[in-house]
């Protein structure tokens, strides 16, 4: 393999490993924090905090206009040109827009605080706390602006440090305040966490030297218009997903009861949070890298395929392990009473492998700022998911929801691929097809074993498939980036 290709694969692997580690650390800190909060505040306190956060997040989802995601594309594209004036202008526009949208969120929460209190708590007793908390929308949006610059300029180590230190300080500041003030510590803790995050983001982003340029309000509007359009599209996608999730949970509750909702929620969290962290880790570097070359379809094709190969070799072994040992995972993360979610999560594991294939293509639509196309694709995907899930649950219960999840991503994968093929002459490399295809077949094999066998035979055959998946993954990584030499060099440096 050529030096350039090896370097490219190593860069992808390093970024994925870096942010994968950060994701794991975030989850561990969140678990520890949740335990402390549960003990110190009790169920009522946790409920109050959750209602505050839900109300604020609802407004933030609308007022932020998706800038935290969409602006990364513009900063990355400017950075890819190495034009210092363009970089400076783009960063300045982003920083102005986050002030405007942050102030908008603050004003909306402050003005609607009586309504938020009434809707969230059923009374007006929490109007003043909502007014005080409105400042967090401005602070969080300013933090998001600094993270956009770090991600867009591909200062990945600084972004990782900022994230890791942020959750650490969140834990360190929260526990003493909750211990000292109890429920009364919720508002000051939420504000202090936001302030800590902003300070950390500012300390790291200020390391990036950007020229001082004058940008008029008209220039801000002109250059920011595309960011806002794409950002609103991303926000709408999130709103579609929220609506579908609400309708689906209501349907499950009406037909199966609240326990069924809990089982579905537990399985959904495992897939999106714990398994989904691989995709979150990949996306942090993949998105700005793809955005920087979005005008070159050939380079985009190569980048998507290379990213897909690395991701498949990491995700495949992870999903085969989950399929075989999911009952133990459910017991560790929840309890024996959640074992009924096993069939749902089993089918959803197949869905996650299919989702990854579609996901790496769908980033092309965002990187190329195809806002209308992105909205159509995401809206159709949500419609598919709702229809498949309602029918699946109606006829097969919780297992049907898992089957629906897998079926959704078969259709979504084909849809994304055909659109990208027609618009950008996109096609996967033979290397990706071979690598992804083998790992997908191993996931299907594991699913079949889990469905057909039980007891020691299931674990014997399942472990054999896991071993094959791991062997092929490690061998594939070693072939592409000389993994063993890479690891040895890292250890030697330490």
Where are these regions (language model features)?
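Helix-loop junctions and terminal segments of transmembrane helices
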Residues: 65-81, 152, 210, 267, ...
């Amino acid at each position: 393999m050529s030096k350039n290709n090896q370097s490219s694969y190593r860069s992808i692997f390093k970024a994925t490993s870096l942010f994968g580690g950060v994701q794991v650390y975030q989850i561990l800190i969140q678990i520890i924090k949740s335990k402390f909060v549960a003990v110190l505040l009790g169920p009522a306190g946790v409920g109050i905090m959750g209602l505050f956060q839900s109300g604020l997040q609802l407004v933030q989802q609308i007022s932020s206009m998706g800038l935290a995601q969409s602006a990364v594309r513009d900063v990355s594209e400017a950075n890819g040109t190495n034009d210092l004036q363009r970089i400076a202008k783009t960063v300045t526009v982003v920083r102005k827009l986050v002030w405007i949208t942050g102030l908008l969120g603050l004003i909306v929460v402050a003005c609607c605080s009586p309504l938020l209190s009434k809707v969230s708590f059923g009374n007006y007793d929490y109007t003043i706390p909502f007014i005080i908390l409105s400042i967090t929308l401005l602070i969080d949006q300013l933090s998001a602006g600094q993270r956009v610059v770090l991600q867009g300029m591909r200062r990945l180590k600084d972004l990782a440090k900022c994230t890791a230190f942020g959750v650490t300080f969140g834990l360190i500041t929260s526990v003493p305040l909750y211990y000292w003030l109890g429920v009364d510590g919720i508002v000051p803790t939420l504000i202090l966490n936001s302030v800590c995050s902003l300070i950390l983001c500012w300390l790291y982003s200020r390391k990036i030297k950007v020229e001082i340029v004058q940008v008029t309000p008209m220039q801000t509007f002109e250059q920011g218009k595309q960011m806002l359009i794409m950002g609103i599209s991303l926000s709408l996608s999130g709103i579609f997903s929220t609506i579908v999730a609400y309708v689906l949970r209501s349907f499950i509750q009406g037909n199966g009861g609240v326990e069924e909702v809990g089982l579905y929620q537990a399985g959904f969290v495992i897939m999106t949070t714990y398994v989904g962290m691989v995709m979150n880790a990949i996306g942090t570097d993949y998105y700005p890298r793809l955005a920087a070359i979005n005008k070159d379809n050939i380079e985009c094709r190569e980048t998507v395929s290379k990213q897909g190969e690395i991701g498949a070799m990491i995700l495949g072994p992870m999903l085969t392990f989950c399929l075989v040992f999911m009952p133990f995972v459910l017991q560790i993360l929840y309890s024996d009473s959640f074992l009924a979610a096993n069939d749902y999560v089993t089918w959803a594991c197949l869905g996650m492998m299919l989702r990854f294939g579609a996901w790496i293509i769908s980033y092309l639509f965002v990187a190329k700022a195809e806002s209308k196309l992105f909205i159509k694709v995401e809206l159709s995907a949500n419609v598919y998911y709702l229809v498949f899930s309602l029918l699946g649950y109606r006829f097969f219960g919780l297992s049907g929801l898992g089957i629906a999840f897998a079926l959704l991503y078969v259709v979504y994968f084909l849809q994304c691929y055909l659109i990208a093929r027609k618009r950008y002459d996109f096609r996967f490399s033979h290397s990706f097809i071979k690598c992804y295809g083998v790992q997908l077949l191993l996931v299907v094999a594991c699913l079949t074993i889990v469905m057909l066998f039980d007891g020691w035979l299931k674990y014997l055959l399942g472990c054999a498939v896991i071993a094959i998946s791991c062997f092929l993954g490690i061998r594939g990584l070693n072939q592409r980036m000389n993994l063993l030499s890479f690891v040895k060099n890292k250890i030697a440096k330490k």
